[in-house]
Amino acid sequence: RSGPRSPLTGSVVRTFTPFYFLVEPMDILSVRGASVIMNCSSYCETPPKIEWKKDGTLLNLVSDDRRQLLPDGSLLINSVVHSKHNKPDEGYYQCVATVESLGSIVSRTAKLTVAGLPRFTSQPELSSVYKGNSAILNCEVNVDLAPFVRWEQDRQPLSLDDRVFKLPSGALLIGNATDTDGGFYRCVIESGGTPKYSEEAELKILPDPEEPQSLVFVRQPSSLTKVTGQNAVFPCVAGGFPTPYVRWTKNGEELITEDSERFALRAGGSLLISDVTEEDVGTYTCIADNENETIEAQAELAVQVPPEFLKRPANIYAHESMDIVFECEVTGKPTPTVKWVKNGDVVIPSDYFKIVKEHNLQVLGLVKSDEGFYQCIAENDVGNAQAGAQLIILDLDVAIPTLPPTSLTSATNDHLAPATTGPLPTAPRDVVATLVSTRFIRLTWRTPVSDPQGDNLTYSIFYTKEGINRERVENTSRPGETQVMIQNLMPETVYVFRVVAQNKHGHGESSAPLKVATQPEVQLPGPAPNIRAYAGSPTSVTVTWETPLSGNGEIQNYKLYYMEKGQDSEQDVDVAGLSYTITGLKKYTEYSFRVVAYNKHGPGVSTQDVVVRTLSDVPSAAPQNLTLEARNSKSIMLHWQPPPAGTHSGQITGYKIRYRKVSRKSDVTESVGGTQLFQLIEGLERGTEYNFRIAAMTVNGTGPATDWVSAETFESDLDESRVPEVPSSLHVRPLVTSIVVSWTPPENQNIVVRGYAIGYGIGSPHAQTIKVDYKQRYYTIENLDPSSHYVITLKAFNNVGEGIPLYESAVTRPHSDTSEVDLFVINAPYTPVPDPSPMMPPVGVQASILSHDTIRITWADNSLPKNQKITDARYYTVRWKTNIPANTKYKTANATTLSYLVTGLKPNTLYEFSVMVTKGRRSSTWSMTAHGTTFELVPTSPPKDVTVVSKEGKPRTIIVNWQPPSEANGKITGYIIYYSTDVNAEIHDWVIEPVVGNRLTHQIQELTLDTPYYFKIQARNSKGMGPMSEAVQFRTPKAESSDKMPNDQASGSAGKGSRPVDVGPDYKPPLSGSNSPHGSPTSPLDSNMLLVIIVSVGVITIVIVVIVAVFCTRRTTSHQKKKRAACKSVNGSHKYKGNSKDVKPPDLWIHHERLELKPIDKSPDPNPIMTDTPIPRNSQDITPVDNSMDSNIHQRRNSYRGHESEDSMSTLAGRRGMRPKMMMPFDSQPPQPVISAHPIHSLDNPHHHFHSGSLASPTRSYLHHQVSPWPVGTSMSHSDRANSTESVRNTPSSDTMPASSSQPCADHQDPDSSSGAYLGSAQEEDAAQSLPTAHVRPSHPLKSFAVPAVPAAGSAYDPTLPSTPLLTQQAPSHPVHSVKTASIGTLGRTRPPMPVVVPSAPDVQETTRMLEDSESSYEPDELTKEMAHLEGLMKDLNAITTA
């Protein structure tokens, strides 16, 4: 057959051929001598050839006289032969249909069963039955013969109906017997040939008896197993008088048999279930009852299901060398087994034919001979079934037609592409195995000579075992990839590889075969056999094992692992021999043990765990919370709780109670109770106080006992069937802050009173309630308000309830009344009774946070002695909850110590805790609340709802949105966005974009058009990184928008000098490791116009500086010359020419408000470097002269921009009226910075990108790199540009600054300790504002602002206040080991900012002296005054920064 033409070559594609069975053979039961037909019929356009198999062997029907093939394909067997030693016809038959050009298919297997010789295993016997009862006559035969059994009554055939019923076994049931049922019965087997008769037996019908007869089962139901669709019969024959009535239940529910289609009663009580289904499985109960009694009998019904297909194999197209999978899903009961057949022959699993996922067939490395029909044959105990599919292998140049989803593995037709005419690629070059392991090999190669770039080439790697002609294929995952990993190989096996390149025209030449052998697999030891563990004592276990049977090399040692059951942590110990005894274990505790053997290659296979429990011992602790309650005059009830968990040391078998009279401590009585937690001690004396203690027992003995606890029996047996009566009297005596309450008991002394309840409150007695002992007769209510009206109520109570209250009121005395002495209390007779007041709540509750899920609660108990030792049976209850969500319920736990470890809490969650104490039946109120917040934990869930959208109008810009993790476990401090074009790439190969934690959206720019990108997001808190989100795919649009040119220019001009670098607010730094910025910088001016402006400003500035410098130099006084000459004589001979050609323009101190230019002292350096400090007005003023450092800026510039928060900065606004503004040569900055000094060890550290939400991240200390390294107007030669970026950060070396700090008259500090670099923040502030900055005033006019001044010895300069410059001077490229910089803002600061002393310019009255001749020097007294003035200015600025 031919089908549609291939879209690749136009050749005709063969279609699948319908080929299947119309009728398949079924199981047959036959008898000797009968004829049998096994039906079989198949369909195919080409008439198939039919053959038959018996027991897996083809039958030769040509020479067989008894078997013949009918025209429709059925098999006829004439005169079935069957004897004891010759059974040629019985067996399993299978029909095989073959079409020569296609293949073969086989039918299901059918069983032919031949009934055996007729014989009876039991025969009818004489029996009698009462009229109306049911009778049964046995005739047991083989199961095969049961269908051939019939019955005769008085030698006449017996007709069967619902009352007279034949069981499947052949027995006869007669229900509701009548007189006509009496007679002689026999059963007959008619299985062909002469019938075989059983013996005759008489059935007698008896009249009803005069007395009732007991019910008895004549035949009970027995459990059955049936196949779906069969009938099931549960016989149930009961006899007795009166005649019993039989009914049935299924799984305890009444079974309705009337009007049911499938359930019916036969012969008076037997249950018939027709067409059994799986829903019929269960327990069936036959219930027979009459007026006198009821009897029951049960039986189970199990149902088996033949195999059924849930998923049938599908037809598959494939190419040679591909891997395919035929899927087959079956069900049945018992679970079916599956085998596969190809063209009628069973498929034997091998390296290339594998059974995967239980039932599926995987064929690896297809070859042409694999074509044909594949059948999945499922079989269980009750049947079999088959389903098939066709495999067609196409030529490599023929594309696989589009079909419903077929089961192809990863090696599909991805290597095929629509073929066009053109040159094909040559063979790939230099195919080598770069990594060879035991089960995988990595291959790499070079592109073909015909296509050296190879960007559009894909590759197919064909490989096979050496000596086997079945090749498999693996394709590269993306175009241009020149390596592949071949996995699932066999160890120590030689494989042959070849690589074929493919372009849009088709497959090219194959590379030369490459033979590679996989590594042999390391032979590790197997599991140690016969591992055994037995407990030697309550705290030790001995483990033994034998030497592993497998392994390569000598066993070096063993490692024994053991773990307490229910715990997560496993412990281990190294063992040299074959046994070990572990000590120090817990008593009567289950432990699991396993052993791992080690050889020179490492650990082997672990043994299975063996579990053993340590031996029991006497309990190690006493029972808890023993309470006593007098029941009457002769008995006391004891209640207690078991010893604490972990102290039982075995199974508690009982409790030993010891008690004695308090007056006779030597006379002790013992009572042994069971495992219950209470005991009533009877036979006690009236009105006598007894001591009790209790101890727990195990089979090993008795553990420690509790402390003695006392209780007193009643004087007389009182009534506790009703509540007590009202107390006979109530008296109150108010004091200033307390009221003394006294009372007398109820007049009726015959009712039990177990205590009194006192209620009180201002205006109402229900505010507070106190319960006291029944012996108490007075109580002082404390902590009341003076001059307040209190209502007091008193009620007696017992176990039935509270009695009638008695009310009284009192007004506490005012504060002025100091008479607090109550004569009534003093003179009242003392009664030694237990403390009647309620227990005081614990105090000093504290919550100590230990981890992210654990908090330790501690408290104190004021009712204990000062040493806080617990000597009684009190216990504490700890409760805790969190208020999020609001309706959270309290959780509680009990403790017998003064601390408790609360575990299982949520990270970063605020909990509240309170404690109460309980002693016997008395409990305190809850203590005051303590709070604690658990520590943070790394996020345990990824950010959610990650979405990616394209920015409108900018197809190369995308916007990533997300939501915080549902389990953040702390404050999210940042996110990291990973993106890549290869979802399978290693994570370290993905591009990252850090984002601050308060942002849930981020833009990524300069992406490639029409390219799929994959995005993942990872959240971070103070504890670390959380898990990554699932990859989200987004394909960028195909079309380019109108802003393409600015984007392209921005990314393409880096390093070419075509336009100045734009450092405006829109500047976005590049990705880490990328040379092109993912941003869209734009310039408000045309690049040519901007260049002209920059050059003009630079020239004008140089001219002005030169003129001012010459003017200042000529006014230097001769006295200054003498001073400098004296300094030179000490430091060495430094000649300094005063020629005009050597004069450099001095740095100028610019008073922004006074608009004055003040020269600073001249530097002694031989080659001083000039630095201008103009006043920037807006962000446009700081455009650099040249953008040759463009690429460096891209690499170094920090993208962290934004407005600083007010609370993170000190303010200088309050001092602006007193101090002149000090400007920096950079872009506009926030008006109120904090200036702090930080040592920066390296300026080339890789920096991360941060979002522009705020100036500084509280969790990072990344360097803020300088934006514009050049002041406006500074002229630079081409030779200076090479190190332009670095020179701004570098400190002058010793070559350019020969006057080092070791010189006594030097005017500058050591470069390593004093030099600084200004690191600019980003620019997003208002352009009209300027940054107030600080300058250090040097002592020489030509010295740069970068070099701080050091006062001469003996000056008033304070050395404890460091002077930090804000701008370094330019210097040639020299290595700098350490640079100290002054940074703006709170950049990663973890401590208060260091005080910075910044001297200001001198006052106006000093102008004349400063403008004298440059060769002059200060007088000593003038220097002293100047230094004192500088010191005052530095202290002022220090006060400002610390404020």
Curated annotation (Swiss-Prot):
It holds the Pfam family I-set. Residues 1-1090 are extracellular. Residues 1072-1082, 1176-1191, 1284-1304 have a biased composition (Polar residues). Residues 1026-1082, 1123-1145, 1159-1191, 1220-1339 are annotated as: Disordered. It is found in: Cell membrane. Residues 18-113, 118-204, 212-302, 307-392 form the Ig-like C2-type domain. Glycans are attached at residues 39, 176, 292, 456, 475, 625, 700, 894. Residues 1112-1443 are cytoplasmic. The chain crosses the membrane at residues 1091-1111. PROSITE patterns: FN3 (PS50853), IG_LIKE (PS50835). Residues 427-521, 527-617, 622-716, 726-816, 841-937, 942-1039 form the Fibronectin type-III domain. Residues 1037-1046 have a biased composition (Basic and acidic residues). Disulfide bonds join 40-95, 139-187, 236-286, 328-376. One of its GO terms (biological process) is cell-cell adhesion. Keywords: Cell adhesion, Cell membrane, Disulfide bond, Glycoprotein, Immunoglobulin domain, Membrane, Repeat, Transmembrane, Transmembrane helix. SMART domains: FN3, IG, IGc2. It comes from the Eukaryota. InterPro entries: FN3_dom, FN3_sf, Ig-like_dom, Ig-like_dom_sf, Ig-like_fold, Ig_I-set, Ig_sub, Ig_sub2. GO terms for cellular component: cell surface; plasma membrane. Belongs to the immunoglobulin superfamily. DCC family. PANTHER family: NEOGENIN, PROTEIN SIDEKICK. May be involved as a regulatory protein in the transition of undifferentiated proliferating cells to their differentiated state. May also function as a cell adhesion molecule in a broad spectrum of embryonic and adult tissues. This is Neogenin.
